[in-house]
A protein has these predicted regions:
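Helix-to-loop junction immediately C-terminal to a conserved catalytic motif
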Residues: 52
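Non-catalytic connector elements of ABC transporters
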Residues: 235, 246-336
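The feature captures the beta-strand-to-loop junction immediately N-terminal to the Walker
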Residues: 37-39
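ABC ATPase nucleotide-binding domains
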Residues: 76-80, 84, 88-227
């Protein structure tokens, strides 16, 4: 069995009374892209800083290709970093920014040209930073991080400075470039769409603890707890009671459900798994949001509010309706 490229064992960090990261462990294969995803204060950035060597660990260790790099400083670890605000030098040209961390030898110009080709900025060497768009500046920062040939690349909220209209295209370009290079990458983001688009794997963090590590599909389809189920993607959470294996009662209606929970539960259901029906849980349409071809409805019921994705003509605002779920996930109420 091939040993992991990166092995993180029991990372912990406390700031005073605040446990920022607690006993975090995971492995990452060479060339994989991992997205650290979580709400504010979940420990994403602290984890990244510990891995990069900018923050001292209270406990744990970090191994790269089997070697313990925990005692090493940032430079000795040979990791690259793209900061949230890029940290480019506005008074220097693109070439000078990318070459900043390279030794002044005969290969410097060829290395700068090589990484600029990789990020699709060939011919931009003489331009100033002020002449570039936000997406181009992001790629200059990426080229500078790649120029010293790091073993591992870190991206801190890499697309947060871009307009929403640019993010989707830039995400695709960034992932394609990193996959072409084949560099192992860890990125921090609070945006689920960004994490799912860039990460081969996504680690969901909450209160400094790893909730689940898996592919985007695994997190969405098979969340391990209620937090992951409701944090990843859109979902409605309602109180229910398990009445039989694979069945949960919500209000006066039984739905199919998955999970090992018993007794009183919280049932989580995705908008695409809820349908309007002739008989089911009664409710009132309190919101109807056009999505283009379909709509997102919010239906208030005695058991709670459900979101439903359905054709726009399915129901009018304030209409009295009945709804049911084709599938759901149930969790014991202490599993949050």
């Amino acid at each position: 069995m091939t040993a992991p490229f990166l092995q993180v064992e029991g990372l912990s960090k406390r700031f005073g009374d605040h446990q920022a990261v607690a006993d975090l462990s995971f492995t990452l294969a060479r060339g994989a892209m991992l997205a650290l995803l979580g709400p504010s204060g979940s420990g994403k950035t602290t984890t990244l800083r510990m891995l990069a060597g900018f923050e001292q660990l209270d406990a744990g260790r970090i191994l790269v290709e089997g070697r313990d790099v925990t005692p090493l400083g940032p430079a000795a670890r040979r990791f690259g970093m793209v900061f949230q605000h890029y940290a480019l030098f506005p008074h220097l040209s693109v070439f000078e920014n990318v070459a900043f961390g390279l030794s002044k030898d005969a290969d410097r110009a060829s290395r700068v040209a090589e990484v600029l080709r990789l990020v699709d900025l060939a011919g931009f060497e003489s331009r100033s930073i002020g002449q570039l768009s936000g997406g181009q500046q992001q790629r200059v920062a990426l080229a500078r991080a790649l120029a010293p040939e790091p073993r591992l690349l870190f991206l801190d909220e890499p697309l947060s400075n871009l307009d929403p209209s640019l993010r989707e295209r830039t995400r695709a370009e960034l992932r394609a470039a990193l996959k072409q290079i084949g560099i192992t990458t860890i990125l921090v983001t609070h945006e689920q769409e960004e994490a799912f688009a860039l990460g081969d794997l996504v680690a969901v963090l909450k209160d400094g603890r790893l909730q689940q590590l898996g592919t985007p599909t695994e997190l969405y389809e098979h969340p391990q707890n209620q937090f992951v189920a409701t944090f990843v993607g859109r979902a409605s959470a309602l109180p229910g009671t398990i009445t039989a294996p694979g069945r949960v009662r919500v209000g006066d209606v039984d739905w199919p459900t998955a999970g090992s929970a018993t007794g009183a539960v919280t049932t989580v259901v995705r908008p695409e798994d809820v349908v309007f029906t002739d008989s089911g849980l009664p409710g009132t349409v309190v919101e109807r949001r056009y999505l283009g071809g379909r709509a997102l409805f919010r239906v208030s019921t005695a058991a709670g509010t459900l979101e439903i994705e359905a054709p726009m003509a399915s129901a009018e605002l304030e209409a009295k309706v009945h709804v049911t779920a084709r599938r759901s996930l149930s969790f014991n109420r202490d599993s949050v």
